[in-house]
Amino acid sequence: MTHPYTYIDPNARIAPNVKIDPFTVIHGDVQIGEGTWIGSNVTIMDGTRIGKNCRIFPGAVLGAIPQDLKFSGERTTAEIGDNTTIREFVTINRGTDDRGKTKVGNNCLIMAYSHIAHDCNIGNNCIMSNSVQVAGHVTMGDWAVVGGVSAVHQFVNIGQHTFIAGGSLVSKDVPPYIKAVRNPLSYGGVNSVGLKRRGFPLQQINHILDVYRTIYNKGFNTSQALEFIEEELPA
């Protein structure tokens, strides 16, 4: 159902059971999957792809051109997976180079005032709390959680099942399964609570803890830590 005060470009492809509230504007080559709800005053730009059963709250701007001086009008996309919620005033820019894309996976929650810049790849089941700012070319693994008002530097890789505390400045890669805190960023142990919530068996969590302690707490260099893990902590 589409409200009469909504503008939809004739080139947009929208599933028949999508609900779009008033004063939303949809430009150009846009695709929206079935069961999705688009709130009022949302702007969806050319090149945006939205999956099934998503919820887009008022004020969001999706698929705007990248904030990158080298962009020169190439055909790029911003792609949002199924069952993802985009809260108020979130901005997601599309990719930069020809056929480039910004991608947000399935079952994600992107809270109010967050920004996802060009060419990011956000995995499935990720959560960004309010006002998280993610710079370009960031990769985020599945089940990552980023606390509010955190900033993520461009080209950073964030591993799966990580937890980043609110207000952190993420200026370096964050390995999988761990907690990252403070500014400057430091690693704060294994994300045991998150792993338990996601059904990891206790034996597996303890193995991850042993590996973490070997790498970060025993005083080994990287080669020594890897050798110790292979010999003493077989998977």
Regions found by a protein language model. Name each.
Residues T2-S186:
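Structural signal for interior beta-strand "rungs" in well-ordered beta-sheet cores
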Residues P184-L202:
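SDR active-site lid
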Residues R197-A235:
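An accessory alpha-helical subdomain
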